[in-house]
Amino acid sequence: MMAQSATFYGNQFVGRKMANGQVYNHGRMVAAHPSLPLGTRVRVTNRRTGKSVVVTVSDRCNCSIDLSRSAFQQIANPRKGRVPVSITRL
């Protein structure tokens, strides 16, 4: 388990190809991570609320983890922008 913080994809990424070759949209349950292998499924848990979501690592980022907007909404209000999370590889 890794303790980090989560952000979410901005609108400018909709329609762009992710590192796995698929096209990003806000409705997919995907995430970008700097080092976990593409295709890895992880549980991302908001450390403040205990809410969690399972996503597939489909892209790369320079941050801890960047969630799709739909995935982020499962664990926090997007107005928060960044939340402390724990990441568990499944």
Swiss-Prot record:
Write down the CDD domains for this protein, in alphabetical order. Answer: DPBB_RlpA-like (cd22268)
Q: Which InterPro entries match?
A: RlpA-like_DPBB (IPR009009), RlpA-like_sf (IPR036908)
What SUPFAM superfamilies does the entry give? Barwin-like endoglucanases
> What does the sequence similarity comment in the record state about its family?
To E.coli RlpA.
PANTHER family from the UniProt entry: ENDOLYTIC PEPTIDOGLYCAN TRANSGLYCOSYLASE RLPA, ENDOLYTIC PEPTIDOGLYCAN TRANSGLYCOSYLASE RLPA-RELATED
- What is the official name of this protein in its record? Uncharacterized protein ssl3177
According to its UniProt entry, this protein's organism is Synechocystis sp. (strain ATCC 27184 / PCC 6803 / Kazusa)
